Each structure stands twice: as C-alpha cells, then as structure tokens.
Amino acid sequence: MTSSSGSLKLEIHTDDKTPGKWSVPLGDDVFRRFLSGGGGSEKAVFGEGSLFSPFLFGKYFDPSDAFPLWEFEAEVLLASLRSLGQCRVDWSQTDQAYVLKSDIPVVGKNNVQVYVDINGRVMEISGQWNSNKKAATNSDWRSGRWWEHGYVRRLELPSDADAKYSEAFLSNNDDYSFLEIRIPKINSKNKF
C-alpha cells in the first residue's frame, strides 16, 4: 500500500438522496454463484483481502450492510489473510483520528465515491466497476443487483468520529488505486 502524498483528494458527499439504494441484499449463496461465474474483474473487486469482499471479516457479511469496523483490531480480524499475503486493507486509530487504507483494483474507469450519511454515523465507499452491463429496469445501478455493476462497503463510524471533517485521498498505478480515509475524533484539536 502507498501513502496519500501525491494523491487526488476526493470529495466526501453528504447529499446522496438515492431511494432504494442497496435495497437488494447480497446473500452468501448469490455471491458465491456470482463470483464462480465471473471473470478476473469480479475476482479483483470482490476477491479475498479486498475491502469489498463479503468474506473480509472472516465470515460472510453483506458489504451493503454497515459494519462497525473500528470496534475490531485489524491485526486480529485480518490475521489469516495477512498470513497468506492476501490482505489489501488496513485500519487503525490514533488519539487524533480513525484511518482506513485500502488498495482498490483498477477495473475500467475507477470512480470511487465516499458518502457520509446526514447524521455522520455511516460512511459508504462505492464505485461502478462494470459500466458495460446495462441495468435491466433501474436507471441507478445501486438499486438492483448492484454487485453486477459496482461495489460498496458501508462502515459504522464510532460515536466520537467527527465525520464532517473527514478526508479521502486516491492515488493510482496500473493495477490498483490506493484509498486512504482519515476521520478525526471529535475532541481532536488537529482537524484536517
């Protein structure tokens, strides 16, 4: 993983008013069928060690459901992936901030977006990886079988996270983009 120096600063949106977004859950059996029938792009986006893999946390967890990431230590939750050299994500916290770092596979046009809900309690990282497939009836790819078109990871933010001062950076190379998100703590004197 690289650092945020020389990176593009992403806008963190708070105005996403998409009704029905992520309303179709990605079940374990559906995901396994999808991944087994997919090619390299699907495996790059959703494969082991990816931030968007439903199996990132050791057991199946739909990435469109909010996960309380910072309640867990990365060293513990990701130990088996790290021992196999398959981990492409890390998170930590300091006295000042919560930090998330992740490699994101470059498949097609990489259009990573970061949203924080209006209450500042859930952060959403998403993007469209397959813009060639047309959504059958939905104009917004996130309202149907979203995994066929894009990816998402929703994270519950800790109660002392000051989401309105969050920063996100994206840097690119040939195979992966590197995403770094920093969320200051409410009582931190060092807002970004």
Curated annotation (Swiss-Prot):
SUPFAM superfamilies: HSP20-like chaperones
CDD domains referenced in this protein's UniProt entry, alphabetically: ACD_ScHsp26_like
Coiled coil regions in record: none
Domain of life the protein comes from: Eukaryota
InterPro entries tied to this protein: A-crystallin/Hsp20_dom, HSP20-like_chaperone
Gene Ontology cellular component list: cytoplasm
Compartment(s) where it occurs, according to its Swiss-Prot or TrEMBL record: Cytoplasm
Main subcellular location: cytoplasm
Quaternary assembly: May form oligomeric structures.
The name this protein goes by in its record: 21.7 kDa class VI heat shock protein
Source organism (scientific name): Arabidopsis thaliana (Mouse-ear cress)
